Amino acid sequence: MNYLKSNPKALGAKRVILLEVAGAFHTEIVSSAKKPLEDTLNEIDISKGNIPVYMNVDAKKVEVSTLKENLVNQIDSSVLFNQQIEYVNKDIDPDLWCHIGPGNVTAGMVRKSISYKDLKVINSLESSK
């Protein structure tokens, strides 16, 4: 990783940012969690909501018919973050984006993708006001 961070052009990138994460999520290391999740999801009913949801497993708007499968596949699939932002921007064209969660790295990635829009970062109770 240090090599890639020092040589981002080896990936065809401008720069490489290491994200601090709590686990090896979205990798084959956690694939064993797929079956228990699938079993649990098969026990519940999921109906269509009123708010569109986009998943980073395929970056597209979720259909109820594929939601459970997408949730299971998201465990060990790559995150299509930039594509997800592009689809939301194209489909919905929101005036305001809210980034909810710790840190600012992904908020910065969103900001660069939608630089002409408002972005509110909520990473604490205080910042939600």
Predicted features and spans:
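Residue-level signal for well-ordered alpha-helical positions
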Residues: 7, 112-113
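Acyltransferase
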Residues: 14-111
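Short, flexible loop segments at boundaries between secondary-structure elements
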Residues: 118-129
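Alpha-helix boundary/capping detector
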Residues: 34, 114-115, 123
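Structural alpha-beta junctions
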Residues: 12, 80, 116-120
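Short amphipathic alpha-helices in soluble, non-transmembrane regions
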Residues: 1-11
